[in-house]
Design a protein with these regions (language model features):
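Short acidic, hydrophobic short linear motifs in intrinsically disordered regions
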Residues: 79-91
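The alpha-helix within a helix-turn-helix
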Residues: 2, 17, 87-90
Length: 266
C-alpha cells in the first residue's frame, strides 16, 4: 500500500484485506486519489467493474471441473461455524466417496476452507468451515447482483455492513493465530486452535454458547478468545461480561475440561 502511494490508514487497509485477503493480484486494482469506499465501488460494484464477476472465474481458474467444489463452498456459506462431512453430503447431494475427500482436501490446501475439530470432540467429527475472504464477501453482498454503482459508499455504517465487519474480523484473527500467540507471549507453547459450541440445557445449568476461537495450550491453559471489531477503543459492557462468564461455565460443564480458562479479548 505504501509502495503504491495509497493514503489509507490501518483500519482501511484491514477492511480491504477483509474483502480480498492478502492476494497481491487484488491489491493491484487500488487507485490513488480515491477513498477506500470509492475504490471498492469501482472495483466491484460499477457496471464494468473489473472484479464484479470474479466469483464466476475464481474456482474455474483453480479447478478443471469446479461445479462440485462450488456446491461445497455454497453449502458452507450457509453456516458460519461450518459443517461436518455428513452435513455437507446432505446439503450438496454429493456422494460419500474418496472423490469428496479429495475435493475437501484440495479446497483446504488452496485456503478456501479450513478443517478443525471442535474442542473435546473426536477427530471423526471434524468440521469444515469456509474461510476465503472474497467468497464470504460475495455471498453477503455480490450474489444478489446489486444495481447501485455506489453500493458500498451508500452502505457504510448500515447494520448489514457492520455485521459483516464483525464476522470478517473473526476470520482475519483465525488466519493470524501465530501473531496472536506472539502477542500473548505463548509463541513457544504447543497449542491446538479450535472452535466450540453447545446447545442450551437448562436442566444442567448450560446457557448455550458459541466460541469461535479457543487456544488450548500444552501448559493446561485455554485462551477463550472474544474477537471484536471496533474502530475505537473497545469497552467491555456488563452484557458482554456476563456472556463471557456464561461461555466459561458452559465450557467447563459440557467439556469437563480441567484446564484453567483465560478470557482473551482481541
Amino acid at each position: 500500500v505504501k509502495a503504491a502511494g495509497l493514503a489509507f490508514n490501518r483500519n482501511q487497509i484491514l477492511q480491504y484485506y477483509m474483502i480480498f485477503g492478502g492476494v497481491p493480484y487484488y491489491w493491484g486494482f487500488l487507485k490513488k486519489g480515491q477513498s477506500l469506499s470509492q475504490n471498492i465501488d469501482s472495483i466491484l460494484f460499477e457496471k464494468d467493474a473489473p472484479l464484479r464477476d470474479e466469483f464466476k472465474y475464481l474456482y474455474a481458474s483453480v479447478f478443471k471441473k469446479p461445479e462440485n467444489y462450488v456446491k461445497i463452498i455454497e453449502a458452507l456459506g450457509t453456516k458460519k461455524v461450518g459443517m461436518t462431512r455428513e452435513e455437507i453430503i446432505t446439503s450438496t447431494k454429493i456422494p460419500n466417496s474418496g472423490d469428496l475427500t479429495t475435493k475437501l482436501e484440495e479446497l483446504e490446501s488452496c485456503g478456501f476452507i479450513r478443517k478443525y475439530n471442535a474442542f473435546g470432540m473426536k477427530k471423526k467429527n471434524a468440521v469444515y468451515q469456509l474461510m476465503d475472504s472474497f467468497t464470504l464477501f460475495y455471498f453477503k453482498f455480490l450474489k444478489s447482483e446489486p444495481t447501485d454503482e455506489h453500493f458500498w459508499t451508500n452502505q457504510i455504517n448500515t447494520p448489514a455492513v457492520n455485521t459483516w465487519l464483525g464476522l470478517a474480523f473473526e476470520r482475519v484473527c483465525m488466519e493470524h493465530v501465530d501473531q496472536i500467540k506472539m502477542k500473548l507471549g505463548i509463541s513457544g507453547v504447543l497449542t491446538e486452535v479450535n472452535s466450540w459450541y453447545c446447545k442450551s440445557d437448562p436442566d444442567h445449568g448450560v446457557f448455550g454458547s458459541q466460541i469461535d476461537m479457543l487456544i488450548a495450550r500444552k501448559d493446561q491453559v485455554i485462551n477463550l478468545c472474544e474477537m471484536k471489531y471496533s474502530q475505537s477503543e473497545y469497552t467491555i459492557t456488563e452484557k458482554m461480561d456476563r456472556s463471557i462468564r456464561n461461555k466459561i461455565s458452559d465450557l467447563i460443564i459440557v467439556s469437563g475440561t480441567k484446564y484453567a480458562i483465560y478470557p482473551t479479548l482481541i
